Amino acid sequence: MHHVLRPIAFRLALVSPLRSLTITHHHLFFTKRTMASSARTYNDAIDALNSLQTPFAVIEARRKAGIRPDAHSVKEMRAYLARIGYSSQDLDRLNIVHVAGTKGKGGTCAFVDSILTRHQRTHGIPRRIGLFTSPHLIAVRERIRIDSKPISEELFARYFFEVWDRLETSQLAKDEVELGSKPIYARYLTLMSYHVYLSEGVDVAIYETGIGGEYDATNVVDRPVVSGISTLGIDHVFVLGDTVDKIAWHKAGIMKTGSPAFTIEQVPSATQVLKDRAVEKGVDLKILDVDPRLNGVKIRPDAVFQKKNATLAIALAETALKKLDPSFKPGTDSLSPEFVQGLEQVVWRGRCEVKEEDQAVWHLDGAHTVDSLKVAGRWFVEECVKKAKGGPKVLIFNQQGRSEAVDFLDGLCNTVKSADPEGTGFSHVIFCTNVTYATTGYKKDFVNHQYNPKDIENMTQQRVFAERWSTLDPSANVMLIPTIEEAINKARSLVDTTEGEQKVQALITGSLHLVGGALGILEKADAL
């Protein structure tokens, strides 16, 4: 069904009339009985966690008032840490590998985790490996991993409520934060991760920052084993600033006196800021070229950006192992088998991931910046050329709540067109919300109170995307579809079954929340 939407003057297919989506913002209330019950479940924990999300109205008011995270944010985290029974000195036992960056920080952390896991299997060191990342793809508990596996629902619930109860009853640091209060969603999970890892005997923990570094919730660690900064670019402009050098200042905040730090080649202005901050902090910062020992190592995807991530990961893993394993000696001319296996066999869901089925080949990448979307576009075309299955090229895209995201589309559209041997780009472009299912809405782990529910119901952001794409490529069939499930089903229906081996070639990108929802639908279960 085709409708012309006014005042937008372009052809736009509207699939499944825009019914009213029920986006429930249920800030949950927990009775004394419920919260004290010994049978508190994973679902109870997720409900309680969701109640800690900052509502859209509060976020918008802060934005208009120009209120940004500052040094007080870290001071509050230290107060909450004290309330659950720990000090920053206790975190030294975790031998933290701390990673910040705009692009590739999650992938770098995954590489480090994979390398350390292979070393552990061969040498028995480290004893237990923690990995803390964000956001989650499918289930909240995947943010807190031990030995490469998300902690179980039972462990998550147990440790979640141990932290909750301590925060309810502790009388410590009453001048810093209100008694009985809890940190907001992401900070709570960071706080909980420290409790999990210290309780479970983890002896090395890899921490990915959330936003920035200097004022990030993870920046309560005073003595990381090593710090790493991946590729820098423009992201989270309101919080971090609108230039790469401003953003570099924030990211450099994770560097600590007495701990080595590494980064990779950056744009000159960012490099200078990192160097200046290293001098200010008395940190030995090394800037790495792509590691020559990667020659012959099968990095996926085989691209410069991924080799940079691998280079940084090698330096971080080697530094950690020098402290943890007295017998460890880094290879000078080549990497050890454990390092090669760790790099080649890493699993990092939702990044350059391909899933194939009868009707479609799904290419999923959680790219969400201008540069990373260009990389995702090139990778998609390369994969399509390799498979040579023909079929329509379909884009499923969303980036919710960021007005600047519309400008990301230009680079993606132009990159795919120029890389495509046929020069045609996407024949169909679908813009959807992050609502997962057509009938039941969100899975609990995906509930997000931080966006304007009216904007989601009216598909306000998606209409802006559609208008821009129709200007960029008037030949594309542009569609608005309310949910991820319906977007996937629509893409499947676009294959021409009379053309034999043809399959839809679909790229799902723009947001890890979108990619996570898509993986859950495609696999019909938790994709953990």
UniProtKB/Swiss-Prot annotation:
Its cofactor is a monovalent cation. It comes from the Eukaryota. This is Folylpolyglutamate synthase. Changing S134P: In met-6; auxotrophic to methionine. SUPFAM superfamilies: MurD-like peptide ligases, catalytic domain (SSF53623), MurD-like peptide ligases, peptide-binding domain (SSF53244). Pathway: Cofactor biosynthesis; tetrahydrofolylpolyglutamate biosynthesis. It is an enzyme of class 6 (ligase). GO terms for biological process: one-carbon metabolic process; tetrahydrofolylpolyglutamate biosynthetic process. ATP binds at G104, K105, G106, G107, R351, D365. Keywords: ATP-binding, Cytoplasm, Ligase, Magnesium, Membrane, Metal-binding, Mitochondrion, Mitochondrion inner membrane, Nucleotide-binding, One-carbon metabolism. Its EC number is 6.3.2.17. It is found in: Mitochondrion inner membrane; Mitochondrion matrix; Cytoplasm. Belongs to the folylpolyglutamate synthase family. The gene is met-6. InterPro entries: Folylpolyglutamate_synth, Folylpolyglutamate_synth_CS, Folylpolyglutamate_synth_euk, Mur-like_cat_sf, Mur_ligase_C_dom_sf. It catalyses: (6S)-5,6,7,8-tetrahydrofolyl-(gamma-L-Glu)(n) + L-glutamate + ATP = (6S)-5,6,7,8-tetrahydrofolyl-(gamma-L-Glu)(n+1) + ADP + phosphate + H(+).
